From Swiss-Prot:
It comes from Desulfotalea psychrophila (strain LSv54 / DSM 12343). It is an enzyme of class 2 (transferase). Homodecamer; pentamer of dimers. This is 3-methyl-2-oxobutanoate hydroxymethyltransferase. Its cofactor is Mg(2+).
Length: 279
């Protein structure tokens, strides 16, 4: 049975930690769902992990709908959160509501997620008032990383911490059903988590959050350019993928693949086709 927003909020109340991972396609979403993941996040991180961009900014609504729909087809009963891409909610409440509706109707997600604090509260309220659950995102917000001075830890000084704390409270008042806290000191995340009734899901925010999220490509060791401090590799798949492909190339070039067990046969003598004597 598919989880609901009520179920996820109840996990916080019961002290049950929430597990969330990104997924971008049907095959991976099926595997993660089979493993028992609580939440699948179709993140705009797909811009870097799947589409080859150097940030999340170029990701479009069409990109998000395409990948969300694939994830939903792979895991029809999973609880799916979908990112609203940059530009889909910054132009006003009406645009935000229409785009959020599209993600639910065409993408099939259960909740939309957007970045920002007090400034996005009117948009959050408008989307929630339209009957669409919203998850917030504070701390390091990748869509506006350039304004923050790059991909850096946020909330280290008291002024920034006070603002983030206040933003979390305002987002809760605006109606969010959960909050991602990214790259902030563990102590700050713990205080924010204790101050709001909705679940917090951390990424680089310590153990004090109600749950944790990682990018699947990072967690499985598929991305080798760099490893953020907050990432733990639960597998190292990149070397295995390379080795498997190298083995395949070697066998193809040597004529060792395909073998008899991989080949279809027939009792027909097809060589007569070459002589034209098959009439």
């Amino acid at each position: 049975m598919r989880k609901t927003v009520v179920d996820i909020i109840a996990m916080k109340a019961a002290g049950q930690k929430i597990s969330m991972l990104t997924a971008y396609d049907a095959s991976m979403s099926a595997l993660l769902d089979q493993a028992g993941i609580d939440i699948l996040l179709v993140g705009d991180s797909l811009g870097m992990t799947v589409l080859g961009y150097d940030s999340t900014v170029p990701v479009t609504m069409a990109d998000m709908v395409h990948h969300m729909a694939a994830v939903r087809r792979g895991a029809p009963d999973a609880f799916v959160v979908g990112d609203m891409p940059f530009g889909s909610y910054q132009t006003g409440a009406r645009d935000a509501v229409l785009n959020a509706m599209r993600l639910l109707k065409e993408g099939g997600c259960d909740v939309v997620k957007l970045e920002g604090g007090e400034v996005v509260c009117p948009v959050v309220k408008a989307i929630v008032d339209a009957g669409i659950p919203v998850m917030g995102h504070l701390g390091l917000t990748p869509q506006t990383a350039a304004v923050l001075g790059g991909y850096k830890v946020q909330g280290r000084d008291m002024e920034a911490a006070r603002k983030l704390f206040a933003d979390a409270k305002r987002l809760e008042e605006a109606g969010v059903c959960g909050l991602v806290l990214e790259c902030i000191p563990a102590g700050l995340a713990e205080v924010v988590t204790a101050s709001i009734a909705v679940p917090t899901v951390g990424i680089g925010a310590g153990k004090g959050c109600d749950g944790q999220v990682l990018v699947i490509n990072d967690m499985l060791g598929l991305f080798e350019k760099f490893t953020p401090k907050f990432v733990k590799h639960y597998a190292q798949l990149a070397p295995l993928v390379r080795q498997g492909v190298e083995n395949y190339i070697g066998e193809v070039r040597a004529g060792a693949f395909p073998e008899a067990e991989h080949t279809f046969t027939s009792s027909c003598d097809y060589k007569v086709l070459l002589s034209g004597d098959d009439q």
